[in-house]
Amino acid sequence: MSELDSQVPTAFDPFADANAEDSGAGTKEYVHIRVQQRNGRKSLTTVQGLKKEYSYTKILKDLKKEFCCNGTVVQDSELGQVIQLQGDQRKNVSTFLVQAGLVKKDNIKIHGF
């Protein structure tokens, strides 16, 4: 009975894995692409983990032009700069980043639904 008592369900945090890999010698630099549900059928795609030497505004400009959506770059205290795009653009963003040569396909993690 004591084994069953110790299994307490906890809340799921979608950003927990991003915070867990702050630094280390053997850690990979992953790019996390997430989708967040807004109101109704509206959704928001976030891209985080790109290298700091890249120009986020130029990447955002190309993404907006390619996918015909609106977006912005948000400065977060914990996560750094995060690109936000309107709509569910997870697959589009991942293929764009790989084709542009910014990220290898193995270093992309797609989260959501």
Curated annotation (Swiss-Prot):
Residues 1-24 are annotated as: Disordered. GO terms for biological process: regulation of translation. PROSITE patterns: SUI1 (PS50296). Gene3D superfamilies: SUI1-like domain. GO terms for molecular function: mRNA binding; translation initiation factor activity. InterPro entries: SUI1, SUI1_dom_sf, SUI1_euk. The modification N-acetylserine is found at residue 2. The keyword Cell membrane does not apply. The keyword Methyltransferase does not apply. Keywords: Acetylation, Protein biosynthesis, Translation regulation. Belongs to the SUI1 family. Probably involved in translation. This is Protein translation factor SUI1 homolog 1. It comes from Arabidopsis thaliana.
